Regions:
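N-terminal catalytic cores of peptidoglycan-degrading enzymes
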Residues: 1-87
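Structured loop/turn residues at beta-strand edges in well-structured enzyme cores
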Residues: 24, 91, 131
Length: 180
């Protein structure tokens, strides 16, 4: 099994459905960026009961992985979302927030340490829940009218070479997953 280090000492976010779900329902990994200027502000927002938003994991700029919501619960990360015939993707997914100011505040490349953590955490989740590459998506894939994250600087091409998600090469016309 992939070796990863996850910090579970952070106070959990209160923003999740309290009834545990069946692990067989977990079919997706959804990547997000925080879209906030400061990492600390993003963590505070994701753990504040008034914000009504959370994720299962938070990846800091230094690569540290924090647990915000235990995987057995439905975190509130996807909002109004759909993929093919499924609606409310929160029910079927693990949400991963990656610290990045996003398009609103000088969108930057993700750090190498963050990408290493994305890779390790993804491999762990893929193995644990038997998640297929075609179901490793960005927030923008499941909420295209509302969201841009994780954005064009997210290393989909690199990750797809490691069997995490797909890279859509228009020139080669391969690795496409059509929804019809």
């Amino acid at each position: 099994m992939t070796k990863i280090s996850i910090n579970t000492t952070l106070n959990y976010s209160p923003n999740f459905y309290p009834k545990p779900r069946k692990t067989k329902e977990i079919k997706f990994i959804i990547f997000h960026y925080t879209g906030m200027k400061k990492e600390e502000s993003a963590i505070l927002r994701l753990t504040n009961d008034k914000s009504k938003v959370s994720s299962h994991y938070f990846i800091k700029k230094n690569g540290e992985i924090l647990t915000l919501v235990p995987e057995r619960y439905v975190a509130w990360h996807a909002g109004i979302s759909s993929w093919k015939n499924l609606k409310s993707i929160n029910k079927f997914s693990i949400g991963i927030e990656i610290s990045n100011p996003g398009h609103r505040y000088k969108y930057t490349k993700f750090s190498k340490r963050q990408i290493i953590s994305v890779l390790s955490l993804s491999k762990y989740l893929i193995k644990k829940y038997k998640i297929k590459s075609k179901f490793i998506l960005g927030h923008s894939d499941i909420s295209p009218d509302r969201k841009k994250d994780p954005g064009e600087k997210f290393p989909w091409k690199y990750l797809s070479k490691k069997n995490i998600g797909y890279w859509h090469d228009l020139k080669k016309k391969k690795n496409f997953y059509f929804t019809k």
